[in-house]
Amino acid sequence: MKFFNYRDGKLSFQDSIAPNHGIGFGARHLDFHQNGNWIYIAVERQSEIHFLRIDEKAISKTIEQKASTLSQSIQPGVRQAVSAIHIHPSGDFVYVSNRAYSSGNYASGNTIPNGEDNIATFKIDKETGRVNLIQNIDTNGSLPRTFSIDPSGRLLIAANSEPASKKNELGQVVQLPVSLNLFKIGDDGKLEQSENLSFPGEDQLLFWAGFL
């Protein structure tokens, strides 16, 4: 992971972080806490959130906390990966999206075993910066590659990026189209399903989603 200084419209290299020489550290996305001292990293293939500290002088190369983003052990035939990570405008919560793939050679039309396509919600300790998993909620689709939180902190929208055939918790095969899933965000940071906007028959992918 590379860090750069930004000044007068120009970037200059500051530091590089590769815990354990980069082994087991597949950083995909990160977000800076509003206090400017904490960084939260989505570590893709490990399905983890990592927490480290930063100050005006240096970036800590010690990962202070590692926490799984999953609600259960990975199921047979499933490969899990995280994607986006965003901190709530209040600074009290951090959200990470989980994606489930087939662990074999997946081709369009094949059925993906039941896995976790969901948003993980973590509560941030205001004193220490450490996180605690408080919720995993399904996005009602497949491969939520990206999501956004509106500036008021009351809504979260997730983009289920690809159509898929997937087994549900009952073992039934269901067809999941490309879709946008809207959640309400409660005062406790937890998400509540609000609306799902699907695009059946679409062969395009939803890579990004945001609020205007």
Task: Label each PLM-derived region with a short phrase.
Residues F3-L11, L52-T62, T121-G129, L182-E192:
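Short loop/turn segments immediately following beta-strands, especially the blade-tip
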Residues F13, Q46-E48, K61, N114-N118, ...:
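A detector of repeated loop/turn-to-beta-strand junctions in beta-rich toroidal repeat architectures
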Residues Q14-H21, Q65-Q75, N132-D138, S194-S198:
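A short beta-strand motif characteristic of beta-propeller blades
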Residues H21-W38, L70-G91, A100, S142-G153, ...:
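Beta-rich, blade/repeat-based domains predominating
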Residues E44-R45, I54, S90, R99-Y101, ...:
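Short loop/turn segments immediately following the C-termini of beta-strands
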Residues V96-N114, A159-Q175:
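Short, conserved, GDST-rich strand-edge loop motifs in beta-rich repeat architectures
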Residues E162, G171-D188, E192-L212:
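Blade-level signature of beta-propeller repeat domains, shared across WD40, Kelch, NHL, RCC1
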